[in-house]
Amino acid sequence: MTQEKKKFDAEVGKILNLMIHSLYSNKEIFMRELISNASDACDKLRYLSQSHSELVASDSNFKITVKVDKDNWQIIIRDNGIGMNKEDLIDNLGTIARSGTANFLKSLSGDSKKDNMLIGQFGVGFYSSFMVADKVTVTSRKAGEDTVHVWESDGLGEYIVSDSDKEFTRGTEIILHIKKEEDIFLDHFRLKHIVKSYSDHVAVPIYFFDEAGNNEIQLNSASALWTRPKSEITEEQYKEFYKSLSYAVDDPWITMHNKNEGAIEFTNLLFIPSSKTFDLFHPDRKRRVKLYIKRVFISDENIDLIPSYLRFLRGVVDSEDLPLNISRESLQHNSVLEKIKNAITKRVLGELRKKKEESSEEYNKFWANFGGALKEGLCEATTDHEKLLEVCIFRSALHNKMISLDEYIAGFKEEQNTIYYLSGDNPDKLLSSPQIEGLLSKNIDVLLFTDTVDDFWVNVNSEYKGHAIKSATRSDIDVEQTTSQSEDKNTHSKKSDDEYKLLTDYFKETLGKLVKEVKISKKLTSSPACLAVSDSAMDIRMERFLIEQKQITAASAKNLELNPKNKIIEKIFNDLKANNKNNEELVNLIFDQACILEGEPVADTGAFSKRLNDIVQKAIL
């Protein structure tokens, strides 16, 4: 018998160290993980057997068994699934083979309390065995192969892989050598209760040996939960299925269990989590809904079953109309799958619309968790943008709460026809921006966009239900024309741009290429000036993002808008009319201030500091 000793990958070592020294109170999740792995092994072989029936010729009835050997301090879990050969044992148990485990590692903080809580959040598969066992022995024979292999470790840095002469049928057996301090798990009644709680939704029969170790008792109905009538499923069963499926500790916020019996037949059991999923913005943008065909698991990877922007969904979809022998490649551009995807998307958006109307408080929590991902759909060409925008909510500057676009439109002033927004990183900073002071002074609301994706979707969604969506940074905004003629007008006499030509020319001459144009603002009420862009130009925040990503090399020159009602601007204008052109330093300071307020870099920070010091010095002397 050949035997090979190997060291765990460093990443696995970190996990094992945490498992061995775990203070996590809910250690029974090791059974959830091992049952889930055994069920997956059976699902994989069931799928393969559709095209390779010889793999199950000797035993086509899948099952999982659990046994307690109290005398030897052992718990034994056995399945007759696909099994593992030597390479599989090394890859699956000696290295990081699962993205969820890799994400678990990235989330470790070094704080033992926080890290122990992560065990429940992520589930860490097979390695959770070491919370209750000081040694684990895995015996396995892969379907279609004759050799039996044994993997064994105490979790302290090394493991042994060997061939075995043991008589062993297809599948995997895991023996947990239970720690002395964890003897509670050797209690027959307690372990039976734990196994039953984690097995009710599993589609593979799970058998538990009696105390004598002779007779098997089936603990679950072995029917897929989603195939049962809703009236026969309790809320607790839905919750447990969700937690087992998604390795979650939270309860689902929304549960959608539907049977579609139209032109396309399928069943979906989908969940929207109540807490933010750890991998929501992972670069892979993986979707976590499993596809079954006639109760046979097909895949949960690289299948376009739900749109990427709904990747926070967890659950299963079971189709009656797809052939069991379909290849994963054929699923990429499959018309039946596309129809299922469209139906699910419509159903999910309908549920969100209903929830938004029922409870704004609950919906706000959902939006804080998943709104950023949902808005990504507004950038996709195939999305029904209007339906998606109906479930989007944004921060209202006027009311300081989250509102929908329909609520915004319902609050239009008499002659208003435009939806205004301002984008930035911080809502509090946006509220103090000069860009929106004029609009707010006329009780015209402005939506505050703070997600990076906002700057992208507004470029492909210029209107909503016939109303333009416009950035408050645009040069052509006139708050007087936006509001009703019956409203009180500012007592300041309104001078045309021509009357202020002396002023705008002076600013342009002083600032030169630093600005594209200098204009009289029709939206400022108190601030002296602000930066602005023309309707055809890129939004300021979007341009800054592209510079950070090195998509463009330099910022473009912006327009500078002046407020002639501001005392500083008024003084400069009066000086010009008196032929006094000695305000160049003040002009530059006003421009620098406008840049800072917009988050734009100041061209010369040293000169800016000197100008500011000079003006302060003059004021106090």
Swiss-Prot record:
Region (B): 329-544
InterPro entries in the cross-refs: HATPase_C_sf, Heat_shock_protein_90_CS, HSP90_C, Hsp90_fam, Hsp90_N, Ribosomal_Su5_D2-typ_SF
Main subcellular location of this protein, as a coarse class: cytoplasm
Region described as C: spans on this chain: 545-621
Subcellular location: Cytoplasm
Alphabetized SMART domains for the sequence: HATPase_c
Highest taxon listed in the record's lineage: Bacteria
Function text: Molecular chaperone. Has ATPase activity.
Complex formation: Homodimer.
Listed NCBIfam families: PRK05218.1
Family, as annotated: Belongs to the heat shock protein 90 family.
HAMAP family for this protein: HSP90
PANTHER family: HEAT SHOCK PROTEIN 90 FAMILY MEMBER
UniProt-recorded name of the protein: Chaperone protein HtpG
Organism: Rickettsia akari (strain Hartford)
